[in-house]
């Protein structure tokens, strides 16, 4: 009772808690952000950018300031620039964040949203207030260097990786309950194998779909009890592990916001990613992408063996031979185009640009 009285379970939802970003010379954060964006616009588009481009940047700047996400952009561009300075391959942009011209100007992304008619509102919309989320890809082999940089910059007690829970799927629920009930493993395994192998199928769906399973439940009360109990625990957490990409960065020590634990000597939150977002904490995805590593290695080999230096920012996106290859389904090893479904789609689409 004494411990219970001392516990505090008051949570603050809907209030964003961004870590503090230190600007050069203590400059006003928004003024510094504007400076970076306007310098970046000149760098990207020249001294006299099209009027529509300048207007788009002003609109984004106003929206970002009003929604309180100036520091968010500054935090992201800081570690992205660090990675680039260290020669760590960084993806050009993925997801809705590629629709921000401000992100393009300051160097978070390298995809021109105006050229490809990308919408800023998919990323940040005043009518749908939610934390924006840049998905940043890094070289798989050097991703940890970027996380280490963020940890040094904000402090080890201000950075943690994020827990993720594996849940009990249909067959696992049957096997776990059968073991607790003391049923013979062979009998339990026979029941589990009657669950169709459809992806993410639930026990209720399995019962509807599998006539042999329904028959066994009707004939054997023990199997009926097994299934009834398994349905109650299906979907519950079974084991904890560390999220492959998620990192939380906080203004005050992480422990002042959420409980922590260690997993393989890594400090992780005991709250999952969606809960952290609801609490207003900054969650970043540091995605390790093997494709970037392969591309960098290929560029190095071309330089070494052929004496040709390739700049991946200046390659031709309208190479007819490449487009013809994609149109015939020859996309093995091409990121996001290598699945059977995408190959068939490319054959039907036959891209021309």
Task: Locate the predicted segments by residue.
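Alpha-helical scaffold/interaction cores of sigma-54-like transcription cofactors
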Residues: 1-353
């Amino acid at each position: 009772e004494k411990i219970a009285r001392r516990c505090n379970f008051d949570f603050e939802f809907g209030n964003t808690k961004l870590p503090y970003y230190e600007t050069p010379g203590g400059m006003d954060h928004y003024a510094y952000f504007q400076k970076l964006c306007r310098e970046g616009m000149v760098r990207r588009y020249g001294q006299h950018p099209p009027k529509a481009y300048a207007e788009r940047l002003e609109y984004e700047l106003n929206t970002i300031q009003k929604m309180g996400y100036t520091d968010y952009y500054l935090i992201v561009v800081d570690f992205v620039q660090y990675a680039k300075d260290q020669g760590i391959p960084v993806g050009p942009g993925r997801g809705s964040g590629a629709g921000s011209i401000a992100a393009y100007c300051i160097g978070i992304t390298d995809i021109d949203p105006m050229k490809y008619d990308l919408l800023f509102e998919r990323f940040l919309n005043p009518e749908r207030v939610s934390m924006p989320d840049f998905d940043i890809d890094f070289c798989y082999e050097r991703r940890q260097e970027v996380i280490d940089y963020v940890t040094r910059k904000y402090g080890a007690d201000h950075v943690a990786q994020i827990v993720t829970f594996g849940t009990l799927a249909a067959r696992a629920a049957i096997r776990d309950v059968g073991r607790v009930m003391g049923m013979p493993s062979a009998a339990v395994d026979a029941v589990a194998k009657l669950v169709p192998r459809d992806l993410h199928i639930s026990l209720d769906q399995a019962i509807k779909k599998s006539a042999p399973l329904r028959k066994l439940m009707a004939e054997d009360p023990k199997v009926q009890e097994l299934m009834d109990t398994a349905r109650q625990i299906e979907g519950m957490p079974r084991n904890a592990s560390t999220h492959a990409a998620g990192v939380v960065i906080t203004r005050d020590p992480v422990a002042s916001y959420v409980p922590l634990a260690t997993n393989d000597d890594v400090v992780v939150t005991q709250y999952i990613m969606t809960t952290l977002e609801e609490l207003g904490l900054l969650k970043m995805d540091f995605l390790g992408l093997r494709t970037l590593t392969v591309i960098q290695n290929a560029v190095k080999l071309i330089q070494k063996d052929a004496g040709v230096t390739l700049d991946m920012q200046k390659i031709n996106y309208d190479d007819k031979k490449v487009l013809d290859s994609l149109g015939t389904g020859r996309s093995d090893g091409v990121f996001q185009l290598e699945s059977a479904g995408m190959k068939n789609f490319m054959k039907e689409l036959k891209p021309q640009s």
